[in-house]
Amino acid sequence: MFGALIKKLVGSKNERELKRMWPIVERINQLEPELVKLSDEALRGKTAQFKERYSRGESLDSMLPEAFAVCREAGKRVLGMRHFDVQLIGGMVLHSGKIAEMKTGEGKTLVATLPSYLNGISGKGVHVVTVNDYLAKRDSDWMGRIHKFLGLSVGVIVHGLEDHERREAYAADITYGTNNEFGFDYLRDNMKFDLDEYVQRPFNFAVVDEVDSILIDEARTPLIISGPTEDSTDKYYIIDRIIPLLKRGEVIEVEANTLSGKRKTYTGDFTVDEKAKSATLTEEGVLKVEKLLKIENLYDPRNMEVLHHTQQALRAHALFKRDVDYVVRDNEVIIVDEFTGRLMPGRRWSDGLHQAIEAKEGAKIENENQTLATITFQNYFRMYERLSGMTGTADTEAEEFHKIYKLDVVVIPTNRPLLRPDFPDVIYKTEREKFNAVIGEIKELHEKGQPILVGTISIEKSEELSELLKRQSIPHFVLNAKQHEKEAEIVAQAGRKGMVTIATNMAGRGTDILLGGNPDGLARQEFKGTPEARTEEFMAAFMETLSKDLPEKELLQSLEREYPGIMPVVASCLKQEGEIDLEELEQQVLAEHQKQFNLLVEKNKPVCAVEHDEVVALGGLHILGTERHESRRIDNQLRGRSGRQGDPGSSRFYLSLQDDLLRIFGSERVSMIMDKLGIEEGEAITHGLITRAIENAQKKVEAHNFEIRKHLIEYDDVMNKQREVIYTQRKEILAGNEIRDSFTGMMEETVGDIVSAYVIDRTPAREWDWQGITDSVQKVFGFHLDLTPDLMDRITPVNFEETLRTTARERFQQRLTEFGDDLMDHLIKVIMLQVIDAQWKDHLLSIDHLKEGIGLRGYGQKDPKQEYKREAYKLFMDMMLRIREEVVEKIFWVQVGSEEEMEQFELEQPQQRMVFNLVDEEAASAPAQMPSKSKRSAGRNDPCPCGSGQKYKKCCGK
């Protein structure tokens, strides 16, 4: 009560934030009349002035009003788009490192240009992050025109670019790209052997579009770079064959003499918990599996892998559905994104689950991969100096954004009032009744011409609904993961009169639905693509036709049919000698294509305008949801496709008690309400109690998913600190910063490690583990300890350690004299990197194994999280010790042969490698002598034995 009164008097936090920004909007508006008078050159010159002021120490914050005003003026001149006042506020929110919640159709893409331009002035780099390659390319081409006009450079990162192209794109003032590409580039950079090969710069400022999708929906999916293992795939087929023989059971509560008066009993061979997405064998099931696989004890430590793969096979059969969670295409299992409905080729479930599903579907089983590098989006984006984001739906997840990313959400008011009524949910008892009602409403609205966007939560449901519409002869488009190539094209026209579009979840997100149709989209359909794409096609066809050596007339005629109106351009570029400047031709063809395309856009504008008015009169775009998603935010995103920029529209959800959400999380409560109200089969109910019960079910799931993500980040934070240590160490090595000192430090720490392991404090030296000491010193440093009885009586742990250190330093000085400073520094650098990378890879595998079994610690009354932190730390310290020892050992033993001895290396390589292994194995017990130089030899053009990846003549053979 008191809180509500305070809120009424001083306003909510959001209102106070907006109130603070309106005076700045006024200042920006006051600058507009002066900027309108400037020529294009003078407006562009403002950027150079801003850069000069920034270099003199002026802050970006103080330049914000002027920079935003300049960017707005450029938008008017280049794109014919003027930023609204509320968009200026959105830009300020982003610049301040917060999340701007802006409703669909309010121009988020245009808003991003404001903070991008302002922060681009610093030259430190701005990353504009989108969810897919299409949007990254579209936005860099479209909005990038504003930045280029103002003199800033623009790059785009999409799949398939070479390293030099990526480096160039990251060097730009503003770089557009996808979250996946940014994350993988970071991991790839930290696996490289040369700082000059890095593509990314230090992380400065990021604007994340669809921030909820990337930072929340994707948060449970770590980015992983992996390499294949050699394990056999037969085990997956063997286990998969027994799963259909197991009977699914239930968990039943029976009366018992316990505190609660009840106990759980299990039927069948396994039970399934759909909330936790887990499947568990019962006692009967364990016995049956042991019998079928002919093993004595499934829980024997030697059979833990069999148990693990059996549980994953159970999950594959009981919890993962084809055309819902994945599709099978060309004998390959491809994951479907549960939030967008898009296919995710290249992504794989970990922990053997993907292989279990491949076995279930009879698809080719790919080997399990070993992790080489990994990071979660949560930890990747927390590395930016300043992070901001925008979306249509963030307020429901405001708590999570603040707790995990320290990001506040500011809700931006709409430019025009929202006119879309969201009708109450309609609930039926069965899915069949629900679909009959959905078809009835679609038919009714379609007959009067109102466009309808139907939202489904899976490919399976969208195709089922499509079949029902076909039976009613209702024309429609289906947009799901199987048609994602046409996604933007179909969604852009979903607002046309009489259009029925079925879309899986948020497919087509990022594309505006204009009532009456999109003139630009219609022009693309008629033109068979964009001017740039058609020009690229034409140039390829032209070069192919040229290769056929046809006479000039025939050449022009063959192309005229496919590219009408282009031949006069070709003719004008042909010189008298029959030569042609291809670069000039491409520019001329692009100009002609742009002209033709613009004519088509202008032709479609009046058609769309008339249709727009008709659709508005019919009530705008109607959103028809066929099932509630686990998250209210996803439902709000679907609703948000209608009612953009003050357009009319409406939305309604049709549900049934058989829907997953209600069946798993809320059916008892809803079913009880329906029974009390006496709902018969075929009848629907619309009631506030039901709506609240559904919202409560969604809140439960959201809280559950938040806990999972929080749990993940708490575990990954441990790895994140370790990753930072390793990657920082790698960078310092690559930069060559005091590399000799680093090695000397490793060498002295290794001496300390040996002393700690074998020397016992406060005991006579004769009782120390001298066998362990001499073996270790011989193995690592390559010298033999010659200890006299007299020395043994006088030695102490302190002077013994100092003696070892002195001897090791002298031995290293000998190696330095032998190799020379430059070669030794190069060897230290390469060997350090090789050892760190190999040990880090093994460490990641150990961490994976630790994660798999850590949950069982709970049964021993131990906190799994604390146990994980403790054991992960121990594993990390053990790895650091191994790194030190291996680096020191390799430096003390490595040999590079003379140039004359290298020529036989290629022929002898397999045998030589065998010898190297033997030499390494024998080194521990051999007397202090170096391996023969002839044992490591390479030809001038062979890969250098040091492992740098370069040819020997350009590396150690210089």
From Swiss-Prot:
UniProt feature coiled coil, ranges:
none
Catalysed transformations (reactions): ATP + H2O + cellular proteinSide 1 = ADP + phosphate + cellular proteinSide 2
- Give the E.C. number(s): 7.4.2.8
Where in or outside the cell it occurs: the entry states: Cell inner membrane; Cytoplasm
Cofactor(s) recorded in Swiss-Prot or TrEMBL: Zn(2+)
Q: What membrane topology was assigned to this protein in its record?
A: Peripheral membrane protein
Q: Which UniProt keywords apply?
A: ATP-binding, Cell inner membrane, Cell membrane, Cytoplasm, Membrane, Metal-binding, Nucleotide-binding, Protein transport, Translocase, Translocation, Transport, Zinc
- Transmembrane regions: none
One Pfam family matching this protein: P-loop_SecA
Indicate yes or no for the key word Zinc: yes
- Enzyme class, broadest EC rank: translocase
Any one annotated GO CC term: cytosol
Q: Which GO terms describe its biological process?
A: intracellular protein transmembrane transport; protein import; protein targeting; protein transport by the Sec complex
Which sites bind ATP?
Q87, G105, E106, G107, K108, T109, D512
Q: Which domain of life is it from?
A: Bacteria
Task: Describe how the cofactor binds.
Answer: May bind 1 zinc ion per subunit.
Recall the GO molecular function terms of this protein's record.
ATP binding; metal ion binding; protein-exporting ATPase activity
Could you tell me which HAMAP family the record lists for this protein?
SecA (MF_01382)
Q: Do you know which PANTHER family this protein is assigned to?
A: CHLOROPLAST PROTEIN-TRANSPORTING ATPASE, SECA INNER MEMBRANE COMPONENT OF SEC PROTEIN SECRETION SYSTEM
Question: What assembly does the database describe for this protein?
Answer: Monomer and homodimer. Part of the essential Sec protein translocation apparatus which comprises SecA, SecYEG and auxiliary proteins SecDF-YajC and YidC.
What family does the database annotate?
Answer: Belongs to the SecA family.
State the NCBIfam families in the record.
PRK12904.1, secA
General function of this protein: Part of the Sec protein translocase complex. Interacts with the SecYEG preprotein conducting channel. Has a central role in coupling the hydrolysis of ATP to the transfer of proteins into and across the cell membrane, serving as an ATP-driven molecular motor driving the stepwise translocation of polypeptide chains across the membrane.
Q: What name does the UniProt record give this protein?
A: Protein translocase subunit SecA
Organism annotation: Citrifermentans bemidjiense (strain ATCC BAA-1014 / DSM 16622 / JCM 12645 / Bem)
Phylogenetic lineage: Bacteria, Pseudomonadati, Thermodesulfobacteriota, Desulfuromonadia, Geobacterales
Gene responsible for this protein: secA
